């Protein structure tokens, strides 16, 4: 609450106006959290938020967290079984309480591998400079089978050296 008075609002909406319905020519922000509002929330936006909350409520947060831990554990197990011997190095903590829903792998050809996976196998991973690939599970909708298949495609991409056919040109999206 202390910051509410100090922060400037970059977009000045009429809902944040001190005397909202006076329609004054000069913006005079209200002094509380209402000063950050821009306008009326859209019905579609509100409905989307409501549906999202319902999904999380029905899935139960403990189940989501458990699936995130189990999913990243599966990824680390597949790394140990398949990818370590292919030159990958695990950068993510093995302790599930010290990681989120993704793991990070280092490889000298990470950029080309990530681009080859997208181009040839329709597997989307995040590339981070200078040489890391981040792989995530979204616990609400990814299955363990999808994780397995994705890692199998990574293994085949590297074993078959598909990534060598990829140029070094930059891509804004990883």
Model regions and ranges:
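PLP-dependent class I/II
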Residues: 13-37, 77, 91-99, 124, ...
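Short, solvent-exposed beta-strand edge segments and adjacent coil->beta transition regions
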Residues: 33, 98-102, 130-134
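Short, solvent-exposed loop/helix junctions and linker helices
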Residues: 39-43, 107, 141-144
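Short alpha-helical functional segments enriched in proximate histidine and acidic residues
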Residues: 55, 78, 82, 157
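PLP-dependent enzyme catalytic core of the Aspartate aminotransferase-like
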Residues: 115-174
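Active-site C-terminal subdomain of aminotransferase-like
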Residues: 1-67, 73
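Conserved PLP-binding catalytic core of the aspartate aminotransferase-like
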Residues: 65-76, 80-121, 148
């Amino acid at each position: 609450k202390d910051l509410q008075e100090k922060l400037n609002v970059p977009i000045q909406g009429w809902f944040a106006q001190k005397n909202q319905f006076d329609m004054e020519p000069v913006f005079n922000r209200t002094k509380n959290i209402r000063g950050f509002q821009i306008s009326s929330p859209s019905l579609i936006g509100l409905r989307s938020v409501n549906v999202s909350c319902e999904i999380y409520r029905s899935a139960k947060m403990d189940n989501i967290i458990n699936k995130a831990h189990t999913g990243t554990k599966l990824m680390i197990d597949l790394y140990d079984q398949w990818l370590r011997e292919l030159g990958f190095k695990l950068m993510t903590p093995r302790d599930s309480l010290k990681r989120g829903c993704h793991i990070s792998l280092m490889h000298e050809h990470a950029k080309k591998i990530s681009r080859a996976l997208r181009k040839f196998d329709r597997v989307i991973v995040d590339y981070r400079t200078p040489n890391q690939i981040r792989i995530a599970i979204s616990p609400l909708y990814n299955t363990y089978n999808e994780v397995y298949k994705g890692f199998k495609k990574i293994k085949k991409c590297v074993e078959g050296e598909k990534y060598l056919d990829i140029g070094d040109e930059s891509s804004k999206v990883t």
